[in-house]
Amino acid sequence: MKNLKILFAFVLLGFTFSCTVDDEDVDNAPLTILNRIEASSNYTFLNYALQRTGLSNVLNGTEKYTLFAPSNMVMGRFLMQNGFSSIDDVPEELLKNILLNHVIAGELPYRNFETGYAKTAALSDATGLPMSIHIEQVNMRVTLNGEAMITRGNIMASNGIIHTVNRVIPLPTVVTFVTADANFKNLAQAVTREDLTVDLVEVLSTNASNSPAPFTVFAPNNTAFVNLLSELGLSSLGDIDEPTLKTTLTYHVIAETNALSSQLSDNLQLTTLGGNITANVTGGASITDGNNRVSNIVAVDVQANNGVIHVIDKVILPN
């Protein structure tokens, strides 16, 4: 088992996107999460990865967890796409954090999934704090970080619950959340506009240990962009000229800083990639741009591996 190899034929098989939800009472499930994984031939790779990283002990205890479990086929595809020939080839600390990105503290049944954010057990390279995971639930179909879908739910265990997923959930960057969260649809459209002379997706995907990461992103929600277009007398994001769009987007990003909401204070001067802004917290957190326009911070501390996102309700504009 030490040099467990990929069966590449798994990758050639098709995936099913329907979700089967088990209806099994936890009281009738004396097996732990680890026992369930060990007992299933579908999770051979996952079981080996858990054993290799020492996480098997965590999932064999009494504390409650929710595990998003990739099957052998899914693990095989992940290894192949990332240039690994076996689980042993994945650096152990990286493998451990990826696995922890599939673990949420507490028991979360399938019916209780709601669109929003939760925290995983994975730790951000930028802060050492737990990372966020975006959950989207539409018509009882659950997608995680915009990439992995639950295909079988509610495999009950004595210490939690298992949901099978059809993709390994990568460690999120700030870009992951911008593209996964429907509240950032307009922002995602803006940062991916083809005529931008700076590749913001590439920049904001930089590893936390490399400059200009980590990042603090003040991310305008969809309503903020709608109101901006009205303010500017424009009909679409495509009507904003490239220089203005570029300077506006970079004005929402602080480089080499992972500023949590707890670190904000009144009259705090912050330097973004596009100029200075001022943070305030009395009466509700907000930021003020160089034109004295105030944007409220409506959600905070969406933690990625390379930075943090705070959601704002108005697009800020540089001088």
Q: Where are the regions that the model predicts?
A:
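Sec-dependent bacterial lipoprotein signal peptides
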Residues: 1-17
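Mature, structured domains of secreted/extracytosolic soluble proteins
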Residues: 4-6, 19-319
